[in-house]
């Protein structure tokens, strides 16, 4: 028997902490919650994106480019969160609008985001690089999105890293954002991370010996595999990630539909088989040779067995494990503290060059 969720998508998957920490204003969230019944979730956010864009155009006319960039960034986030819950034409419409708005925002941001047009195996892969102020060369952090999150969503985390003297690079890989049209979710994401490393090592503003990777949610899975397979990476953060999808049965109905969508298959069983194979990392985790920070919330949908896997397979001398007893998925419910701690850890490793000692915080749970 097929069980269909009766919960609205915005109630099933919406995490207020995530959206607010990523830059969506509390007032906009309240507006979405309290919107008139005749206005859909999608239409509310797309209309709001238009309003932010219009205000940005007014700011440009007045010579206030910095404010315009912030407003366009807000517009892009509105388009992102309009579409990320759907698997029909709304997804494509919102995605295209988000890309358009972010392209407008990019040169107006502080620091600006420069778009580099890469091609990997014949597939176009735009990469945005932001360089911090001050003399270089600078360390850099490659940021990886998740199941429905894309490069534009990392803006606030980028800013924390940039403020600490590190450059950032963002892109969409297989099954994500701009690349989804060309390639479904696949088991070779590390190839695309390595292509970004190739790009960064050619930039005079970047320190070749201090490039790290940070991945959120599914991106945390990608970060672990990238660190295992790309020896040029000097640091790795898996932020609410996982090592495998053995826990498929624990996923929500909407998350399973999302896996099906990015797999470009017709049935949930086909999706399960595809992503289970594509996202397996346990065979390579022992190859990780750089400092690795893993953040996991006890109340995450990803089971605590992930922690056992990490402790068994990731070399102990490289591991910094943080388990938050009150944390949800990616610990979005804990405010900015976990993000600051990750940014500071990256600073210690990549900027200050500290030899971070292996640590375990919050584990074992009753320890």
UniProtKB/Swiss-Prot annotation:
Pathway involvement of the protein, from the record: Alkaloid degradation; nicotine degradation; 2,6-dihydroxypyridine and 4-(methylamino)butanoate from 6-hydroxypseudooxynicotine: step 2/2
Effect seen on changing residue 153 to A: 32% loss of activity
Entries under Gene3D superfamilies matching the protein: acylaminoacyl peptidase (1.20.1440.110), alpha/beta hydrolase (3.40.50.1820)
Entry-linked SUPFAM superfamilies: alpha/beta-Hydrolases
Location of the active site: 148, 217, 300, 329
GO molecular function: hydrolase activity
Outcome, altering residue 149 to A: 84% loss of activity
Keywords per UniProt: Alkaloid metabolism, Hydrolase, Plasmid
Cell cycle is among the record's keywords: no
Domain of life: Bacteria
Enzyme class: hydrolase
Catalytic activities: 2,6-dihydroxypseudooxynicotine + H2O = 2,6-dihydroxypyridine + 4-(methylamino)butanoate + H(+)
pH dependence: Optimum pH is 7.5.
Entry-linked InterPro entries: AB_hydrolase_fold, FrsA-like, FrsA_esterase
Its EC number(s): 3.7.1.19
Gene Ontology BP term (one): nicotine catabolic process
Subunit structure: Homodimer.
Family: Belongs to the AB hydrolase superfamily.
Role noted for this protein: L-nicotine is used as a growth substrate. Plays a role in nicotine catabolism by cleaving a C-C bond in 2,6-dihydroxypseudooxynicotine.
Protein name per Swiss-Prot or TrEMBL: 2,6-dihydropseudooxynicotine hydrolase
Species annotation: Paenarthrobacter nicotinovorans (Arthrobacter nicotinovorans)
């Amino acid at each position: 028997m097929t069980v269909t969720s009766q919960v609205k998508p915005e109630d099933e998957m919406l995490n207020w902490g995530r959206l607010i920490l990523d830059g969506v204003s509390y007032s906009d969230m309240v507006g979405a919650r309290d919107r008139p019944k005749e206005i859909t979730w999608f239409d509310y956010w797309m209309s709001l994106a238009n309003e932010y864009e219009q205000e940005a155009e007014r700011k440009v006319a007045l010579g206030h480019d910095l404010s315009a960039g912030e407003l366009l960034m807000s517009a892009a986030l509105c388009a992102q969160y309009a579409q990320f819950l759907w698997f029909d034409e709304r997804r494509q419409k919102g995605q295209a609008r988000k890309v358009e708005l972010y392209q407008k925002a990019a040169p107006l941001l502080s620091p600006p985001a420069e778009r580099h047009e890469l091609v990997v195996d014949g597939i176009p892969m735009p990469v945005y690089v932001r360089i911090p102020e001050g003399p270089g060369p600078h360390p850099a952090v490659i940021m990886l999105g998740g199941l429905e999150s894309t490069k534009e969503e990392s803006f606030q985390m980028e800013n924390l890293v940039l403020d600490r003297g590190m450059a950032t690079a963002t892109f969409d890989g297989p099954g994500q954002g701009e690349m989804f049209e060309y390639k479904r979710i696949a088991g070779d994401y590390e190839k695309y991370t390595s292509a970004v490393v190739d790009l960064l090592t050619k930039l005079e503003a970047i320190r070749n010996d201090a490039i790290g990777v940070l991945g959120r949610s599914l991106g945390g899975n990608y970060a672990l595999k990238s660190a295992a397979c790309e020896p040029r990476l000097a640091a790795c953060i898996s932020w609410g990630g996982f090592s495998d999808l053995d826990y498929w049965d624990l996923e929500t109905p909407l998350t399973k539909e999302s896996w099906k969508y990015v797999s470009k298959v017709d049935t949930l069983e086909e999706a399960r088989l595809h992503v289970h194979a594509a996202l397996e990392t346990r065979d390579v985790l022992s190859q990780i040779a750089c400092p690795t920070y893993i953040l996991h919330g006890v109340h995450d949908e990803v089971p605590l067995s992930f922690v056992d896997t990490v402790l068994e397979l990731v070399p102990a001398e490289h591991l910094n494990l943080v388990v938050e007893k009150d944390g949800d998925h990616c610990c979005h419910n804990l405010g900015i503290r976990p993000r600051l701690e990750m940014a500071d850890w990256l600073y210690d490793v990549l900027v200050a060059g500290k030899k971070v000692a292996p640590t375990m915080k919050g584990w074992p749970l009753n320890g």
